Amino acid sequence: MQNKIIIHGARAHNLKNIDVEIPRDKLVIVTGLSGSGKSSLAFDTIYAEGQRRYVESLSAYARQFLGNMEKPDVDSIDGLSPAISIDQKTTSKNPRSTVGTVTEINDYLRLLYARVGTPYCINGHGAITASSAEQIVEQVLALPERTRMQILAPIVRRKKGQHKTIFEKIQKDGYVRVRVDGDIFDVTEVPELSKSKMHNIEVVIDRLVNKDGIRSRLFDSVEAALRLGDGYLMIDTMDGNELLFSEHYSCPVCGFTVPELEPRLFSFNAPFGSCPTCDGLGIKLEVDLDLVVPDPSKSLKEGALAPWNPISSNYYPTMLEQAMASFGVDMDTPFEALTEEERDLVLYGSGDREFHFHYVNDFGGERNIDIPFEGVVTNVNRRYHETNSDYTRNVMRGYMNELTCATCHGYRLNDQALCVHVGGEEGPHIGQISELSIADHLQLLEELELTENESTIAKPIVKEIHDRLTFLNNVGLNYLTLSRAAGTLSGGESQRIRLATQIGSNLSGVLYILDEPSIGLHQRDNDRLIESLKKMRDLGNTLIVVEHDEDTMMQADWLIDVGPGAGEFGGEIIASGTPKQVAKNKKSITGQYLSGKKFIPVPLERRSGNGRFIEIKGAAQNNLQSLDVRFPLGKFIAVTGVSGSGKSTLVNSILKKAVAQKLNRNADKPGKYHSISGIEHIERLIDIDQSPIGRTPRSNPATYTGVFDDIRDLFAQTNEAKIRGYKKGRFSFNVKGGRCEACSGDGIIKIEMHFLPDVYVPCEVCHGRRYNSETLEVHYKEKNIAEVLDMTVDDALVFFSAIPKIARKIQTIKDVGLGYVTLGQPATTLSGGEAQRMKLASELHKRSTGKSLYILDEPTTGLHTDDIARLLKVLERFVDDGNTVLVIEHNLDVIKSADHIIDLGPEGGVGGGQIVATGTPEEVAQVKESYTGHYLKVKLQQ
């Protein structure tokens, strides 16, 4: 096999007919500015062709379900291996998908518990074992010689009644003696039993002395006892000891039964093992009392009950007033001062007790009736589940939250699965082991106490689990738990988890294509990620990694720099070679940063802010250890720390939600904290995340930033438009009139693929131009509206330079480094980083109040160092206007540019959640306990 992947004539997207050679079995980094064509080369050319060739190798029957994969725009690719893409966009949002299911560790855990687990009675009656008649005989014969015993068949266990028919049947079957409540009676002389008391009844099958020659008789008696006792028997050894046996997995004391242990019992995605209350989700949608009574200091008359606010309707407040008068509850007493009984009445209703309700509505309709009082919680639940109105359901949903299931306590499984332990009764059940962090899980596997037989069975299973956990640990995910929902993971976390699955497969000869695996990873953990990538390479695989991290680039075997610019100014191979060769290439911007010729300078001075703070006290959500944190306003703040240290919990779960709740009346409940102050110093909260700017191809940069309204105004003012009577709406692709009706102005037709992702194809009528031919006959400066939407931001800036209102808005898009995108580029095709910068652009042209709080979570995702320099200038513009910018970030160039750092740690998970250091970058760099400070010190000295 040749030792290179040779590509000729690649033209996907902005690639300019490039030729490139990529060494096989090496770690190859593809880098370049955002939009330069890196992903077009790695994913849309190399991976797409590898996938297409694989599909073509399948049978015609299999191909009919996959459809024809379009050949990428490339002349030829030689030396291609089977390709596996590990990107950041394919994270499952299904609530049933967890870290354990994605990595397949759960499959091995289920097998482990099915093979070496022991069930224990949930009522505390010890281990539950299943024994055959032969095993029971062997255990009885092992008793001391001359032991006197009687074999009993339990037929009534803790049941009320006189049980006369049972005694008649025992006599009819030919048995002579019974034991009733511990006393032996002749079956014909049993005293009359009390109807109202619980009774135990056992039939005496045989009486024996343990000695040679009794095996045959004992075996017959045991079989008879099991038959009569429905699989249970008791051995009474006459000296007061009793042995309980069962041929089922069933507790002989209370009857708690466990089915045969098999892997499906431990799956929360199968009805056999899932919790019957929450169906294996671990959470239930329940009414949240904190949302129903947001301010307990208010009285019922003052509107303490949010769902029954008199603003929307007077019906429920009237009912409440009349009910409380009837039941003697004071409406003027603060809710928190009501007795527990009174609060229960208000929340959950009066049960069967009725009150007289009289109500006249606005139309004169009258209700005069004696009814029970429903209670506000019961009312919200009923209206949510019974209404046919989406509006009402959404309103009621605002008073509900996903709370931990009270039946399974969040473990997702039923009692039969959770009663099985490994390593004795003190060992964990499968739910508990899934709640451990990866690091603790590894330690538990080392300390697991198994019998010799169990160890032999468990050894290959434990090895598979250990290998996968070790890799997760090695890529900085030691703080995650197997029960963590996949939908809550960041892009970088989910990608590294899928890497763990691939390393576990031990494949060789594969082409892996990765998209920025270092995202969300602290510098401390980056070296371990690089080692893991090298391990995959050493197995005989080729790794093509789209990456911007300088450390990763310097450790690569080969570097390909795509550029020189973005969009139509990119798409060329600027440099290709070893990192040292690229660093010497004067044409390569990447090379200039690697060699140190270009760099992001450290600010000459730090801003002092406006002297005000937002202060959170007692932040205790997830792993946060009751933190008191001050966020200085009027500064550029960076929240840092190793992965899992609590950054997102502090900023996104507590600060952002608490501020949104106060400023925007947001119903999203913040995480646990004691108090927050200083929100009055800000007027707006702007969350600039990486979610799409629109979920359909109709949304694009022009519509999102609002510049399209101005462009449509301009077209409506042209002479041709006035002659035809066209107004502004004629140039909208969202309403009838000027748009192409064949595709409803989308320019593309969606083809539903059912169980595959939907496919979009260009409209055959308008050929993707969105408008009908009459609309396209109107021109401004010889361009029609469709041609304007096809312009890049850079071209549009020149085209509209004479129209300041339009040029100003387009300039903001260029300022955030998106000069290469087209005005009409569908929002669905923008990356997370591009969407985030588009949101920044839309904020830039708004008039600043100087009292805004901007929150950004890892804004450097997908950005080259040159793009980061541009991003920092934009963020600094916000701060210079008096606003506060808060970023969660690992990138040292951003961290060193901040005015104030809040460093969390010291570790991830349970080892984190503390403030390790705060202050300027220079101050944090001096804190020895801070991992961030350690790397920052080096960066500040460069």
UniProtKB/Swiss-Prot annotation:
GO terms, molecular function: ATP binding; ATP hydrolysis activity; DNA binding; excinuclease ABC activity; zinc ion binding
Segments forming domain ABC transporter: 308-589, 609-937
Annotated ATP binding sites: 32-39, 641-648
Signal peptide: none
Keywords in alphabetical order: ATP-binding, Cytoplasm, DNA damage, DNA excision, DNA repair, DNA-binding, Excision nuclease, Metal-binding, Nucleotide-binding, Repeat, SOS response, Zinc, Zinc-finger
Localization: Cytoplasm
One biological process term in Gene Ontology: nucleotide-excision repair
Zinc finger intervals, C4-type: 251-278, 740-766
Source species, domain of life: Bacteria
GO cellular component, one term: cytoplasm
PANTHER family (UniProt xref): UVRABC SYSTEM PROTEIN A
Biological role stated in the UniProt entry: The UvrABC repair system catalyzes the recognition and processing of DNA lesions. UvrA is an ATPase and a DNA-binding protein. A damage recognition complex composed of 2 UvrA and 2 UvrB subunits scans DNA for abnormalities. When the presence of a lesion has been verified by UvrB, the UvrA molecules dissociate.
Family stated for the protein in its record: Belongs to the ABC transporter superfamily. UvrA family.
Assembly description: Forms a heterotetramer with UvrB during the search for lesions.
Protein's UniProt name: UvrABC system protein A
Originating species: Streptococcus pyogenes serotype M18 (strain MGAS8232)
Gene name per UniProt: uvrA
